[in-house]
Amino acid sequence: MDLKTKSNIFQKIFAENWDEYFIFDTINSNNLTYKNFFELVINIKKNLEKRKVKEDDYLCLILNNSIELIALFFAAALLKITLICIDPSRGSDEILKMSTIQKSKFYLIDDKHQNFDIPETEIFSNIFQKNTNLNISISDLDLFNDLNYERLFTITFTSGSTGIPKGVMHNLNNYLKSSLLFNKRFNFSKNNIFYHNLPLSYIGGILNLLFLPFFSKSKIVLDEQFNISKVSNFWNNPVQYSVNTFWFTPTELSLLLKLDRGNLGIEYCKNKTIVGLVGTASLREEIKNNFENKYDLKLFESYCLSETFFVTTNYLNNDQANHTGPLLDDVKVSFTSDNEILLNTPSMFLGYLGLSNDEFFNNNGFYISGDLGKLNNNSLQILGRKKDLIIKGGMNISPKRIEDFIIGLKIFDEVAILGIEEYYMGEKIVCFYTSEESNLNNEIKLINNQIVQKLGLYFKIDEFIKLKILPKTPSGKINKPALKSKYNE
């Protein structure tokens, strides 16, 4: 896509749909047309300019989902600034570590009572206080002609096997290209209404549920982030707003199967044409089949990494069981001798903030994914992981980060953290430990309380197992495969 076409795509989408609805905000019962939304974007842009925010500045966002946060992404593109996106549900230590990787102009938070030990925090609601002298017209869309698609746009965070959060850098061009390539498989349009219930601090919330719908000229129903308390009334807002396009996570699917005891979702799916997309983690075939049978809703699994964006997807009339689908156009894949997936995509990330790219790419410029897989009839099958990560509820979690934290508490003699397959969350976190103490019930409660406070709820240990000794390799390292086998006996 040439520069002129890129520059016009924002302007064209807004202009062609100026008086049509774009976002239905279920959080605040506020429905915005493209015109209303553009007014909000310009309002936030002007308020940031009043605070001396200028080109190439960084803003750190520690924010929950809101329609104003969505507008901030568009305002940031116009201002040519970079957004550092951090999940506010992470623990205080994790947030502090991420927020100090790069100096920011402001650190935006939702509530003055949030205590992240970060200076220069600003309450986000101050940024979108309405300017009374705004006179927006369709001609103001010319502002989009000056967008810079190549400069650094977002930094999101992923957990590496070392336990140190890595800042994944992307430009606006990557969001555009990946969205358009993915949409070639589905042909989304203004008839599609996406249900947005993933956090806007991760790629799933930004790419899958913001820019993919926008560049597809689709509508968005914005809701709070999904959690287990939302299961019983999961279908209420989708039914009310006639949602017909979902991005499910495997955790959502398994929890709906277990806890959704009503007929609202079943009847809705049976009587409406719905696209069910699945991402963020591998989907077990058992869960897929059970969900499709219960709701009469076809699920299309895809493969997408924070670093590469969309790689593959199943789609209508091209859906192979136990596979994540054919490669998208212009995506290249290779494999090492032990089946590790190597990737080259048109929307490859710019690198990790502050780190050299050398250890993450091979000599041919392919990204070393850490996942294992193979191609069958041009469809990618994921076989497992090479890197030491736990995926719990779609969240990448470093076992080493938890091990180091527990060791620092000096309660156990030895510690090993493993991810064990679990039906609802994908994997559960199991702590194997040794100790000469016989009763550590209070200490175990203390460990989990500290983990939730400092690292975040997703890091909470699901099961503690005491052993006399932890098995070791000949080199003296803890033998995690042996531990996993012992657990499964």
Please describe what each predicted stretch is.
Residues 176-193, 203-245, 259:
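Conserved AMP-binding/adenylation subdomain of ANL enzymes
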Residues 326-330, 336-364, 395-397:
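Conserved ATP/PPi-binding loop(s) of AMP-dependent carboxylate-activating enzymes
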Residues 3, 18-19, 134-157, 164, ...:
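Conserved pre-ATP/AMP-binding loop-to-beta segment of ANL
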Residues 345, 372-459, 476:
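AMP-binding/adenylate-forming catalytic core of the ANL superfamily
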Residues 244-248, 257-319, 332:
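Gly/Ser/Thr-rich phosphate-binding loop
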